[in-house]
Amino acid sequence: MPSKTKYNLVDDGHDLRIPLHNEDAFQHGISFEAKYVGSLDVPRPNSRVEIVAAMRRIRYEFKAKNIKKKKVSIMVSVDGVKVILKKKKKKKEWTWDESKMLVMQDPIYRIFYVSHDSQDLKIFSYIARDGASNIFRCNVFKSKKKSQAMRIVRTVGQAFEVCHKLSLQHTQQNADGQEDGESERNSDGSGDPGRQLTGAERVSTATAEETDIDAVEVPLPGNDILEFSRGVTDLDAIGKDGGSHIDTTVSPHPQEPMLAASPRMLLPSSSSSKPPGLGTGTPLSTHHQMQLLQQLLQQQQQQTQVAVAQVHLLKDQLAAEAAARLEAQARVHQLLLQNKDMLQHISLLVKQVQELELKLSGQSTMGSQDSLLEITFRSGALPVLCESTTPKPEDLHSPLLGAGLADFAHPVGSPLGRRDCLVKLECFRFLPAEDNQPMAQGEPLLGGLELIKFRESGIASEYESNTDESEERDSWSQEELPRLLNVLQRQELGDSLDDEIAV
C-alpha cells in the first residue's frame, strides 16, 4: 500500500459516500471491541444538545459512583445490536452460555439515535426504545481509538440502510404475490413455505407488528382516527453540526428517498405500493388504534393532574384568604376596643369639664374673688389698661408703701376718681393675726390689684397672657413713682359677666 504524501491525504474510511462493509457481512454480523460505561433511562430527546447532555451525565454519574468500565464485544447485524460481555473462559468450563454473557440486545428498528461526543470522540452511544414499556434507554461506550468509535457509528448507520433495502425487497415480493390471486396471496404473504426467513426478513416482518415511535401513520379508510404527526427522528436531518466528527451515517446515494440513520426507513416509502392486508382488522391497524388509545389515556391523565393541581392551588388560596380574613377581624376587634377606651376617656373628660363649669357658675361672688385672687397672686400683677397719663409702677419695696398710705393725696389728674376709666383699683389688705402687731415686722402688703373687665370664660386666656407682660413690667426703672396699691372707694362686685372683678 503506497504511503500517504501531502498530495494523497484522502482516507476512504472517512468518506461518508463509501460504505465501510459489504452488505452480506451484516447477515453474519460485524464485531467490535469496546468498553461499556453504563446505561440510564432518559426522556425522549428533542435535540442533539439533550442527547449529548444525557451522554455526559451518564459518564459523570458512573464515574462518581466508581463503577468500572466492562470490556464488551459489540455485534452489529441485520438482527440488531448485541452487546456481549467479554470474559476469559475457564479451563474446566467447556460450555459457553451466551445468555449469561449477554448485556443487551436491541433490534435495528428500535434504535432511536447513534452518535459520539464532540468533546471526546472515543465516547459514543446509542438510544434504544424498550418494546414493552416504551422507555428510552441511553447506552454509553468507550473505544480505544477515535477512528474505532467512528467506524462503529457508521456501521450501525449502514445496518439501518441494509435493513431498509431488505424491507423494500420484501414489500415488493408481497405486492407481486398479491396479483396472482387470493390463494397465492395467502401463501406468498409470509414468503416460501419451505424457505426459512433470514434475519433481515424477520426484521421487516416485525415492522408489520410493531412500528417505530416515529413512524408516520397511514390513514385507514372508513375509520375516523385522529391523524397526528411526530417529530423527525434523525436529529441531524434538521441541522447538522459542522464538526470533524460523524454523528450519524448518511446514505451513499443521496438521490434515494431514505434516511440512513433513521428508523423511519424501515417503513415503505410513499412512492411504493401499500402492503397487503392493511385494511381494517390487520395487526398494524390494531396496533395504531391501541397506540392512539394509549395516548388519549395519557392525555386524560395529564388533564386530570392539571385539574388536581388547580384544585390544590384554589384550596391554598382559600386557606390564605381565610387566614387573612381572621387576621383582619382580629385587628378590627382590637380597634373597636381601643375606640371604646377612647370614648370612655372622652366621656370622663367631658364630665369633668361639666363639673368645672357647674362649679364656676355656682360659686358666690366672694368665692369667685378668692379664686381669682389666688390666680393673680401666683401669676403676678396684670398690666393696667388705663390712659397714658397713668404713672408706671416703681419698686414695691419703697418706704412709701408702709407709711403714707392713709395720708396719700390724690392728684387732680389722677384716673382713680374717674368713672370712665378702664381700670379701677381697690385696696385688699390682709390683716395679721394680732391687731396690735405693727406693720414693720416683715409682713408684706398685698400689691395693687388691677381690675379688668372680662368674662368668666376668658380667665385662662387672660391668665396666660400675663406672662409676657410681667416681664415688661419688671423692666421698668425703680426711680419712677410707685403704683397705687390701695383703692379709695370699694364698690360691690356684680355677678354678671360684664362686671368688674378683681384679678
UniProtKB/Swiss-Prot annotation:
Q: Which UniProt keywords apply?
A: Cell junction, Cell projection, Coiled coil, Phosphoprotein
Q: Where would you find this protein in the cell?
A: Cell projection, Filopodium; Cell projection, Podosome
Principal location: other
Q: Where is this region: Interaction with NOS1?
A: 491-503
The modified positions for Phosphoserine read: 183, 187, 190, 262, 368, 371, 398, 414
Region annotation Disordered: where it falls in the sequence: 170-212, 266-285
Q: Which Pfam families match?
A: PID
Q: In which tissues is it expressed?
A: Mainly expressed in brain. Highly expressed in accessory olfactory bulb, caudate-putamen, cerebellum, cerebral cortex, dentate gyrus of the hippocampus, islands of Calleja, olfactory bulb and supraoptic nucleus. Expressed in kidney glomeruli podocytes (at protein level).
Q: Which GO terms describe its molecular function?
A: mitogen-activated protein kinase kinase binding; nitric-oxide synthase binding; PDZ domain binding; protease binding; signaling adaptor activity
* CDD domains linked: PTB_CAPON-like
Coiled-coil annotated spans: 319-360
Please give an example of a GO cellular component term from this record: T-tubule
Where in this protein would one find the motif PDZ-binding, according to its record?
Answer: 501-503
**GO biological process terms held by the UniProt record:** neuron projection regeneration; neurotransmitter secretion; postsynaptic actin cytoskeleton organization; regulation of calcium ion transmembrane transport via high voltage-gated calcium channel; regulation of cardiac muscle cell action potential; regulation of heart rate by chemical signal; regulation of nitric oxide biosynthetic process; regulation of ventricular cardiac muscle cell membrane repolarization
Q: Which domain of life is it from?
A: Eukaryota
Report the residue ranges that make up the PID domain in this protein. 26-191
Q: What does this protein do?
A: Adapter protein involved in neuronal nitric-oxide (NO) synthesis regulation via its association with nNOS/NOS1. The complex formed with NOS1 and synapsins is necessary for specific NO and synapsin functions at a presynaptic level. Mediates an indirect interaction between NOS1 and RASD1 leading to enhance the ability of NOS1 to activate RASD1. Competes with DLG4 for interaction with NOS1, possibly affecting NOS1 activity by regulating the interaction between NOS1 and DLG4. In kidney podocytes, plays a role in podosomes and filopodia formation through CDC42 activation.
Q: PANTHER family annotated for this entry?
A: CARBOXYL-TERMINAL PDZ LIGAND OF NEURONAL NITRIC OXIDE SYNTHASE PROTEIN, PHOSPHOTYROSINE INTERACTION DOMAIN-CONTAINING FAMILY MEMBER
Instruction: Cite the record's note on assembly.
Output: Interacts with the PDZ domain of NOS1 or the second PDZ domain of DLG4 through its C-terminus. Interacts with RASD1 and SYN1, SYN2 and SYN3 via its PID domain. Forms a ternary complex with NOS1 and RASD1. Forms a ternary complex with NOS1 and SYN1.
Know the name of this protein?
Answer: Carboxyl-terminal PDZ ligand of neuronal nitric oxide synthase protein
Its taxonomic placement starts with: Eukaryota, Metazoa, Chordata, Craniata, Vertebrata
